[in-house]
Amino acid sequence: MSHSPLFTSPPKSLCILRLSAVGDVCHALAVVQHIQRHWPQTKLTWIVGKTEMGLLSGIEGVELVPYDKKSGWKGVWNLWMFLKNNQFDALLNMQTAFRASIISLGIQAKYKIGFGKKRSREGQWVFVNRRVQDPETPHVLDGFMAFADYLGVPPAEMLSWHLAISDSDREYAKQFIDPTRKNLIISPCSSKAEKDWLVERYAEVANIAHQHNVNVIFCSSPAKRELEMVKKITALCDFQPVDASGKTS
């Protein structure tokens, strides 16, 4: 930490604004729970997308406020009304999308914190009064951890993710997992096809993992594009990986 921390004592309440997508929300969860471990008495409120809400449901000590982007201005207004009596010590706007910046206008917080110059996009800087320092490493998680660092939370030796997973879900997942060796789960599709990695490279990674006696599992949503992507990859594999595409949530 090369700057003075924003808080030298635990804040009473923080609001996290990260709506989507599932992968980014997973990274944000590690940061939120890291803050939670350091400041267990701080009230944490997380505004999250309706779809991503299903992933986070059941996590302890965090108030989840869902927002459906399909609800338009009515949804934004309803969100503002729901939070109108909340005065947060800080808002962590961890999403650069213009929609998130608009939502932030109706959130009452002394400090509204956004990304640094390198990562800020879509005019986010207009809607914040504090900006984190850009990390030297480019990974999404590093960008999110910069928010915890800016608040005054010490770095974590090792981050952890704790999701509320039901016993039935754990039992269902056992059919895909080999408990006698390491398991590699590959989810090759992003929300947009243009963001996807090359089919040949996924197959190459899978083949290398298999050569090291790793159980390779492919997963995806039931969407046609994603099922076809997995089919193309597995066709290039030198072995038969576990195909869980369209079978998990």
Pin down the residues of each PLM region.
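Catalytic machinery of carbohydrate-active enzymes
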Residues: M1-S249
